[in-house]
């Protein structure tokens, strides 16, 4: 407590009061308002990308256009009336007709001139399979299965699913083959593949056609030419080393060192004390050091 003046305020009581107010308010209400959590839906993001108002949306649109160049979808509009002209050359030569309502083409074979048979298709996209129907009977054609229609001679491209047809020829049996091929690649178009031949339905592009022999090209790679050309290089080397006189061999004098260690002088310096007078003093220094490095004291 200070000696003079007003006493210091109680800070601890003030802070506890503030904490009580915060905790009391939290119990009464649902909680503190910390703001709204950021959430951006996917639709809002795509909408911003489609506005083309900033650089990012423009780059996204250009990327979509580049990607669409390399994407080919199996869309039913591929087999429209305008695109059927490109597939006419792939039809069989006998009794073939390309359908416009379904995805597929069919043809009929028989042993006599008159032909009659049913037709079918594989729905919207087709299945890429072959169906062989063979039967005998009288009449122009028959229909079987749910959702079937009456077959007509040589027609194809009907929209019935699971339709089969039977027919009869004058004095022989009829054979109806339907080939569903919803996609013909540009490679097959360029090579002139006939889809009615079963052998050519699956094509190995690596084994297609005869492999031509590689042409014998001349090599223009530079190689090192010997000095004087190849004519001189083919001859044997006639160069010989010249003879020269090395002279007599002089022997070096052999130097023999004295191996007696006891006769070697000692250059170890000994301390000389201060002299008190001018009288000469003789000091006898014992230099009889044993040759052995270890002594009895050690």
UniProtKB/Swiss-Prot annotation:
This is Myozenin-1. Its main location: nucleus. One of its GO terms (cellular component) is Z disc. Interacts with ACTN2, ACTN3, FLNA, FLNB, FLNC, LDB3, PPP3CA and TCAP. Interacts via its C-terminal region with MYOT. Keywords: Cell projection, Nucleus, Phosphoprotein. It comes from Sus scrofa (Pig). GO terms for molecular function: actinin binding; FATZ binding; molecular condensate scaffold activity; protein serine/threonine phosphatase inhibitor activity. Residues 118-129 have a biased composition (Low complexity). The gene is MYOZ1. The modification Phosphoserine is found at residue 82. The lineage of its organism: Eukaryota, Metazoa, Chordata, Craniata, Vertebrata. The keyword Nucleus applies. Myozenins may serve as intracellular binding proteins involved in linking Z-disk proteins such as alpha-actinin, gamma-filamin, TCAP/telethonin, LDB3/ZASP and localizing calcineurin signaling to the sarcomere. Plays an important role in the modulation of calcineurin signaling. May play a role in myofibrillogenesis. It is found in: Nucleus; Cell projection, Pseudopodium. Residues 136-172 have a biased composition (Gly residues). One of its GO terms (biological process) is negative regulation of transcription by RNA polymerase II. Belongs to the myozenin family. Coiled coil: none annotated. It holds the Pfam family Calsarcin. Residues 1-34, 105-173 are annotated as: Disordered.
């Amino acid at each position: 407590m200070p000696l003079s003046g007003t006493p210091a305020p109680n800070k601890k009581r003030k802070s506890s009061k503030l904490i009580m107010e915060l905790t009391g308010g939290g119990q009464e209400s649902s909680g503190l308002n910390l703001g709204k959590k950021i959430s951006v839906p996917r639709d809002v993001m795509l909408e911003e990308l489609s506005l083309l108002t900033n650089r990012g949306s423009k780059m996204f649109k250009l990327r979509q256009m580049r990607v669409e160049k390399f994407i080919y979808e199996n869309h039913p509009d591929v087999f429209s009336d305008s695109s059927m002209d490109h597939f006419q050359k792939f039809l069989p030569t006998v009794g073939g007709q390309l359908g416009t309502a379904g995805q597929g083409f069919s043809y009929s074979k028989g042993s006599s001139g008159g032909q009659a048979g049913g037709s079918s298709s594989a729905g919207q996209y087709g299945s890429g399979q072959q169906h062989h129907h063979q039967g005998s009977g009288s009449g122009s054609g028959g229909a079987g299965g749910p959702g079937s229609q009456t077959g007509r001679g040589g027609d194809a491209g009907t929209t019935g699913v699971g339709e089969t047809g039977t027919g009869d020829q004058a004095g022989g049996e009829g054979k109806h083959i339907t080939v569903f091929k919803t996609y013909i690649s540009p490679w097959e178009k360029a090579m002139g593949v006939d889809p009615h031949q079963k052998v050519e339905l699956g094509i190995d592009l690596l084994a297609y056609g005869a492999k031509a022999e590689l042409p014998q090209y001349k090599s223009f790679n530079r190689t090192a030419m010997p000095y004087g050309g190849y004519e001189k290089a083919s001859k044997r080397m006639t160069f010989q080393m010249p003879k020269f006189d090395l002279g007599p061999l002089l022997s070096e004098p052999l130097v023999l060192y004295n191996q007696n260690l006891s006769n070697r002088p000692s250059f170890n310096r000994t301390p000389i004390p201060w002299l008190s007078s001018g009288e000469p003093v003789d000091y006898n220094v014992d230099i009889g050091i044993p040759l052995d490095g270890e002594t009895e004291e050690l």
